[in-house]
Curated annotation (Swiss-Prot):
GO cellular component: mitochondrial inner membrane; mitochondrial large ribosomal subunit; mitochondrial ribosome
Name of protein: Large ribosomal subunit protein bL20m
Annotated localization: Mitochondrion
Species for this entry: Bos taurus (Bovine)
Keywords for this protein: Mitochondrion, Ribonucleoprotein, Ribosomal protein, Transit peptide
InterPro entries documented for this protein: Ribosomal_bL20 (IPR005813), Ribosomal_protein_bL20_C (IPR035566)
């Protein structure tokens, strides 16, 4: 930027300050009280608002995730499943739906969610049967239980 004379340079500095002030006041227009008119108060309020806005972006993700989990928990309990068992068995069945989609299904597509709950419940029952086995101990293992014949 080239300034040909001192008056032009001074004039430019003044206009720069004016536009800088206007930029801050533009962000402060919706604030209450003197914070939307007085530059000194507006600078503090706008800075504080920007800091909170930055922090809130990460908090929003956390809040939405807890909301989705609460909705899925409530919907899965209607079908007789707890949330951890429901999610774990869906993962074992290779159903790759995230929590947002599951929460939306629970609200807007209850029949679809019911079928997912049935799938999860069936997988859980299969796991119990596999864990129990046939009820006999394998050969060559000493048990503390004394068998009397």
């Amino acid at each position: 930027m080239v300034f040909l004379s001192a008056p032009l340079w001074l004039r430019n500095r003044i206009t720069d300050r004016y536009w800088r002030v206007q930029e801050v006041l533009k962000h402060a227009r919706h604030f209450r009280g003197r914070k939307n008119r007085c530059y000194r108060l507006a600078v503090r309020a706008v800075t504080r608002a920007f800091v909170r806005c930055t922090r809130a972006r990460s908090l929003k993700k956390r809040h939405l995730r807890t909301l989705w989990i609460n909705r899925i928990t409530a919907a899965s309990q209607e079908h007789g499943l707890k949330y951890p068992a429901f999610i774990l068995n869906l993962i074992k069945c290779q159903v790759e739906l995230n929590r947002k989609v599951l929460a939306d299904l629970a609200i807007y597509e209850p029949k679809t969610f019911k079928s997912l709950a049935a799938l999860s419940k069936r997988r859980r029952e299969e796991g119990f049967v596999a864990a129990l086995g046939d009820g006999k101990e394998p050969e060559g293992i000493f048990s503390r239980v004394a068998q009397h014949h």
